[in-house]
Amino acid sequence: STPLYSSAASDVYKRQMLDHETVSKYDWEAKACRPLATFDGCSFNNGSKSNPCLQGDILGDWREEVVVRTADNTALRVYVSPLPTPYRFHTFLEDRPYRLSIVTENVAYNQPTQPGFYFGAELERSGKLFRGYQFGK
């Protein structure tokens, strides 16, 4: 499973899971993963590892996109979040460790993208400036 940065406004710091052709979210009350989206008509790479062609904040709005190929290998699809977000963070691509983790994930060692900074729930309550966004108290 590969974590994706969430795009729902209420879940800004919770990562979703990309596992094979499904994006899921962990339901703490039910203690189970719930599917959010599937990539119908698409094929992933590397057999049992089932990797997308690319995963990362490629459009520059801090949320991660997934690039996959169609099952007939005639096109690429870029999947983006349809959910609006009130957060306006600087793109994760400005962070060198994050850029390097995209390269590592997609051309070599299969590990999820990682930023070079802490991105946790406490930030929202901090009232501090974070990557160009001012949190309220």
Spans of model-derived segments:
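Surface-exposed loop/turn elements that mediate protein-protein interactions on large endomembrane-trafficking
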Residues: T22-C42, L83-P86
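Calcium-coordinating acidic loop motifs
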Residues: D57-L59
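Hydrophobic alpha-helical transmembrane segments
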Residues: Y26, L76-V80, L129-Q134
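Repeat-based blade/solenoid architectures
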Residues: S6-S10, C42-L54, R96-G136
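Hydrophobic beta-strand segments that make up the repeating blades of beta-propeller
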Residues: R15-H20, V66-R69
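Calcium-binding loop positions in Ca2+-binding modules
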Residues: W62-R63
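Loop/turn residues immediately N-terminal
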Residues: E21-S24, N73-A75
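Single conserved hydrophobic/aromatic residue that forms the stacking wall/gate
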Residues: S1-A9, Y13-Q16
